[in-house]
Amino acid sequence: MNIIEHLTRTVTPILLNNSTDANRSSLLEKLYAILVARFADGHVYNGFASATIADNDTGFFDRLLPDASHRTTLVQELSKHYSVPEQETQSLVSRAAPLVLRELRTLAGNTPVNTFLGSHLSSVASAIPAWAYTFIPASVLGLMNINAAGAAPVVKTTTRTEEHLVATPKEDNGGLM
């Protein structure tokens, strides 16, 4: 089973109100791959395993990816790569996350979602853009045979300042001194 194709058939029409837009559909496919990879990690999924998440819980994405800088980067990258305005991309991402979880729970049935996804990651790996590796737990990257060392490192903001000395000519007052 290709989970990304399934989500594209079931979730995308809801998010796009049954319209067909290649850029938005492609954006959502990449988002689905990233979300599936996050849910495949036991530590990530177990935080939501017994939670009731409403389909319209737009704050769910904030809990799924708690680092605000990661959320911002994810939205900016998707927006840039698929030429969709950032505000609209943010809305699509926030609306998609709970629907994806609901659909994954349905597919998994009585099996824990992360366990179910572990056996379906091969169909997801090729859909994850390299810039998104930083959002995927290293254990999941390993299951997909993606070298975690190749993932973008998480870097805190670094500021570097330098002093530059500039020579200015001295006024000529005449005389020796």
Regions from the language model: what does each represent?
Residues 1-177:
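A structural "flexibility-hinge" signal
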